[in-house]
């Protein structure tokens, strides 16, 4: 089971409800894809490493902490990876960046790529999405270049 908390406070009755529910979800999560920004706001994590460690303590086997333009911090099989996020030129709209990253990462894992390779592919897809308006790429763009291998 993969899980991106993607916390939206206005959908919950209280912060306590958010934290209690998400903590229960982690007990059945195999792959977690949290955003450090969300986690720092709701859990008080002071760094992406804090987020990674908190998810690991809950028993999540594979964790990828997204951090906007900051480095991705990840862990699987006890191995920690810190992967800088490439600079993206021509950013138009950051909507969907995290979802695109997740799609690229999970598709790559399913295709047999290791965790670091999957992070790179997720970063590429997320980076391309933010160069266009809207939260997803058109079929024409997606079916060309480095994204062809996702289809």
Summary of predicted features, one role per range:
Residues 1-54, 69-72:
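Conserved beta-alpha-beta core of the PfkB/ribokinase-like small-molecule kinase fold
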Residues 44-151:
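Conserved phosphate-binding/catalytic region of the ribokinase-like
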